[in-house]
Amino acid sequence: MEEKVEKIFYILTCAGENPEKAAMPFVLASAAMAMDIPATVCLQGNGVYLAQKGYAEHMVKGGGFPPIKKLILDFVEQGGKIWVCVPCIKERNIAVEDLIEGSETTAAAKVNLEALQSSAVFVY
């Protein structure tokens, strides 16, 4: 197993049904990136909808945060990684080709390894 380095791992399991909660990991992950702390947001369950092209454009803004699409784009532009659960997109009939730029698919082993290697893990 690799040595733990300073990085933060966020797991998000909701989307449009809870826009404020869906925004939180992207706000925190962008702040981490601004602090030179690498961050990854892993979308699981309904969270995978956020990686579907066109979905975020139609989401209601959550809390006092900017629109979720802007939060996602800002995070990716800072070099943040977005992982999307393969079984979750299959269950929701979302094709890999329909995922936003800057996202990549992942499965259980990679998610577990990232959690073990991260300084902190937050689940939303």
Identify what each model region corresponds to.
Residues A22-M35, V41:
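Histidine-anchored nucleotide/phosphate-binding helix
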Residues Y10-A23:
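Short, glycine-rich nucleotide/cofactor-binding loops
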Residues D74-F75, W83, K90-R92, V96-D98, ...:
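A short aromatic-anchored loop/beta-hairpin motif
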Residues G47-K61:
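N-terminal beta-loop-helix "entrance" segment that forms/cooperates
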Residues M33, V76, A115-L116:
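Anion (oxyanion) recognition and catalysis
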Residues V5-F9, S118-A120:
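Polar low-complexity intrinsically disordered regions
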Residues H58-V86:
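A glycine-rich helix N-cap at a beta->alpha junction
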Residues P38-Q44, I82-V86:
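Short internal beta-strands
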